[in-house]
Amino acid sequence: MAEGKMMSDFLPFSRPAMGAEELAAVKTVLDSGWITTGPKNQELEAAFCRLTGNQYAVAVSSATAGMHIALMALGIGEGDEVITPSMTWVSTLNMIVLLGANPVMVDVDRDTLMVTPEHIEAAITPQTKAIIPVHYAGAPADLDAIYALGERYGIPVIEDAAHATGTSYKGRHIGARGTAIFSFHAIKNITCAEGGIVVTDNPQFADKLRSLKFHGLGVDAWDRQSGGRAPQAEVLAPGYKYNLPDLNAAIALAQLQKLDALNARRAAIAAQYHQAMADLPFQPLSLPSWEHIHAWHLFIIRVDEARCGITRDALMASLKTKGIGTGLHFRAAHTQKYYRERFPTLTLPDTEWNSERICSLPLFPDMTESDFDRVITALHQIAGQ
């Protein structure tokens, strides 16, 4: 009984905000008899284009899948180099490596954890075939400067927007400048358990993505049924099985309709955290100086032992004993075993400093005032205040 009560009282780092709308959306798809990729995918893609201002959107089974086929569509392969921050989820690095290319990991700004144009430019070589900036924690990277580099050197930019549904940069939603990849993973601002979407204004690129995500065929099963096309399509080039079922797409659509309200609640909680941190030794990330709207996917603090009297890992363990979950976004990719052994001499000082200290606090739309007070009380207790 005691263990069951402890689990029921546990405050997770994140929890999806699901309700009657999502249940109704799933029922509609189940009742339709078409549960795999179909009309709900088309609705989701159109709705996401309205959000970002792009001409094309391609729904996929995950943002990782989207990154894989986006790199393939650019022709990334053996001997090519792709610039990315090490402060990112390892899936980006994995996709680069699996295509035979070389990831070129660069440092980030110490206080925003954003990749900087200076670090990107210093890493450009004749072999550089793509730049992947990360919109970190819900804030945007400095796109004007990054796209200027891409244009100057003739290098495509693929925006990692997994954290950035609802994020804007200088008045435009992330993705509006070119190509961006969003995530619908369970902890993201909108979710359908697993899924993602790639936005672009390039019709040829979008066509390649659609083919690569579905076996290399020119059409999917719904296209063949609804469009009266030949029952057997031809393989244009070898592809993958990365399509998103309509069950997932319907949930994502229901979530997308709530995006403004969900993100407003996230922003309100983040503002409370910022106010509370004024009396605590833990350091939140700094906000970018350029005009933006923050989606507040994560609220991250840095736990420096010299300043706080406790290590990050000890803080996370202590919060867990108090029934409070936390996250680590991210352990720097170049410190992971495979990449540590592949790049043994790589040092990225600001990335490494943060990788040892960052901690994501609970932040989700259904978080209550009581939940918030519980986190802050625990942090005061741990800090000895």
Swiss-Prot record:
Alphabetical list of InterPro entries matching this protein: ArnB_NH2Trfase, DegT/StrS_aminotransferase, PyrdxlP-dep_Trfase, PyrdxlP-dep_Trfase_major, PyrdxlP-dep_Trfase_small
Top-level class of the enzyme under EC nomenclature: transferase
Family: Belongs to the DegT/DnrJ/EryC1 family. ArnB subfamily.
Subunit structure: Homodimer.
One Gene Ontology cellular component: membrane
Gene Ontology molecular function terms on file: pyridoxal phosphate binding; transaminase activity; UDP-4-amino-4-deoxy-L-arabinose aminotransferase
Record SUPFAM superfamilies: PLP-dependent transferases
UniProt GO BP: lipid A biosynthetic process; lipopolysaccharide biosynthetic process; polysaccharide biosynthetic process; response to antibiotic
PANTHER family per the UniProt record, alphabetical: TRANSAMINASE (PTHR30244), UDP-4-AMINO-4-DEOXY-L-ARABINOSE--OXOGLUTARATE AMINOTRANSFERASE (PTHR30244:SF41)
UniProt name for this protein: UDP-4-amino-4-deoxy-L-arabinose--oxoglutarate aminotransferase
Catalytic reactions of this protein: UDP-4-amino-4-deoxy-beta-L-arabinose + 2-oxoglutarate = UDP-beta-L-threo-pentopyranos-4-ulose + L-glutamate
Active site: 188 (proton acceptor)
Cofactor entry: pyridoxal 5'-phosphate
Pathway the protein takes part in: Nucleotide-sugar biosynthesis; UDP-4-deoxy-4-formamido-beta-L-arabinose biosynthesis; UDP-4-deoxy-4-formamido-beta-L-arabinose from UDP-alpha-D-glucuronate: step 2/3; Bacterial outer membrane biogenesis; lipopolysaccharide biosynthesis
Gene that specifies this protein: arnB
Modification sites for N6-(pyridoxal phosphate)lysine: 188
Effect the entry attributes to changing residue 188 to A: Loss of covalent pyridoxal phosphate binding
Superkingdom per UniProt: Bacteria
A Pfam family of this chain: DegT_DnrJ_EryC1
EC number(s) reported in the record: 2.6.1.87
Function: Catalyzes the conversion of UDP-4-keto-arabinose (UDP-Ara4O) to UDP-4-amino-4-deoxy-L-arabinose (UDP-L-Ara4N). The modified arabinose is attached to lipid A and is required for resistance to polymyxin and cationic antimicrobial peptides.
UniProt induction comment: Induced by BasR.
Species of origin: Salmonella typhimurium (strain LT2 / SGSC1412 / ATCC 700720)
Activity control: Inhibited by L-cycloserine.
